[in-house]
């Protein structure tokens, strides 16, 4: 029987994750689990105090994604807000029961650029605890809202290590206003930080005329030609290196309420909502996907081999 959110209308514990083992040619399908009213483009129209009174729409989108992933025998990593874990626990339980990885997206969807070290620590600690208490499994991954770990905020990696995370997936190897980490390697890699080792899974990019182009999904899936996304993942497959794709539940929900925001933010948030599901279907048909956590042993072994070779 297919797993749906409705099966988990009351919180339950003891649902272990069952990540699928992958080889180096499988890519990473990731979902940033948040409500439509929690995103940056709409924050001028909705305050945090309004969240609880807004109609929730995340469950239907999660059901659609779970069905699609199951049909393509794909496993995914879901970066979930702590707020979702406390307000819509059945959504998180359904994801875990379907065999996908649960990871952290912070608690309040606060960008790291607006937090100091201790506020960031509190955010990643409380979100990790909320998720682990709910699904009774360890949470080892984190993604910053809006990919907001940028140059100058490298201390965030040390906090993640100190709080028990094993990997991050916040770096976009591009330069964009508000986010981007151009110096990041484009492939999964291990960082040696003062606090310890942390694996990094950057978002997928490609190059046009030697210029790095974002090609990981999300708004780029909705607004760029699909050929750009396909190119990035084909290039990664040819290199036998996994690439990271992402999507938000609200991006496959064309029926969501339209909020009064600027023309630019309307374009960013609402354009392409009606075609996103079809495009995701095409991506899943062409490429295989698994969880990020399932690749950690492979990446760790490669990093250890390189370190040993370098010391010889």
Which functions belong to the PLM regions below?
Residues 16-18:
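Short, positively charged and aromatic/hydrophobic N-terminal segments
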Residues 21, 71-72, 223-312:
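C-terminal domain-boundary segment and adjacent tail
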Residues 21-101:
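Active-site beta->alpha N-cap acidic-glycine motif
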Residues 32, 69, 105, 142, ...:
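Conserved, mostly hydrophobic/aromatic
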Residues 48-56, 80-81, 108-120, 145-148, ...:
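The substrate-binding groove and active-site-proximal loops of carbohydrate-active enzymes
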Residues 62-66, 89-92, 121-128, 157, ...:
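Generic structural signal for well-ordered alpha-helices
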Residues 72-153, 165, 170-177, 196-197, ...:
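Metal-dependent polysaccharide deacetylase catalytic core of the NodB/CE4 family, i.e.
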Residues 133, 137-140, 144-241, 245:
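Active-site-adjacent pocket scaffolds in enzyme catalytic domains
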């Amino acid at each position: 029987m297919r797993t749906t959110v409705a099966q988990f209308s009351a919180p339950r514990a003891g649902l272990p994750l069952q990540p699928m083992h992958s080889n180096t040619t499988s890519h990473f399908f990731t979902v940033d689990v948040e409500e439509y009213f929690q995103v940056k483009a709409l924050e001028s129209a909705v305050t945090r105090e309004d969240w609880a009174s807004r109609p929730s729409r995340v469950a239907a989108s999660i059901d659609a994604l779970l069905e699609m992933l199951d049909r393509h025998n794909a496993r995914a990593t879901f970066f979930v807000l702590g707020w979702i874990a406390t307000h819509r626990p059945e959504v998180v339980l359904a994801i875990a029961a379907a065999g996908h990885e649960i990871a952290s997206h912070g608690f309040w969807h606060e960008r790291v650029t607006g937090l100091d070290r201790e506020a960031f620590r509190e955010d990643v600690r409380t979100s990790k605890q909320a998720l682990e208490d709910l699904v009774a499994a360890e949470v080892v991954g984190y993604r910053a809202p809006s990919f907001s770990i940028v140059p100058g905020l490298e201390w965030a990696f040390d906090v993640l290590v100190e709080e028990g995370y094993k990997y991050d997936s916040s770096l976009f190897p591009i330069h964009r206003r508000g986010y981007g980490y151009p110096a990041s390697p484009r492939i999964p890699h291990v960082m040696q930080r003062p606090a310890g080792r942390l694996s990094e899974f950057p978002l997928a990019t490609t190059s046009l005329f030697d210029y790095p182009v974002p090609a990981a999904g999300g708004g780029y899936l909705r607004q760029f030609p699909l050929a750009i996304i396909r190119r990035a993942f084909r290039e990664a497959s040819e290199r036998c290196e996994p690439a990271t794709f992402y999507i938000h539940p609200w991006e496959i929900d064309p029926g969501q309420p339209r909020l009064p925001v600027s023309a630019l933010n309307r374009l960013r948030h609402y354009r392409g909502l009606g075609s996103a599901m079809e495009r995701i279907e095409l991506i899943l048909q062409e490429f295989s996907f698994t969880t990020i956590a399932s690749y950690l042993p492979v990446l760790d072994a490669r990093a250890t081999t390189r370190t040993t070779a370098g010391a010889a």
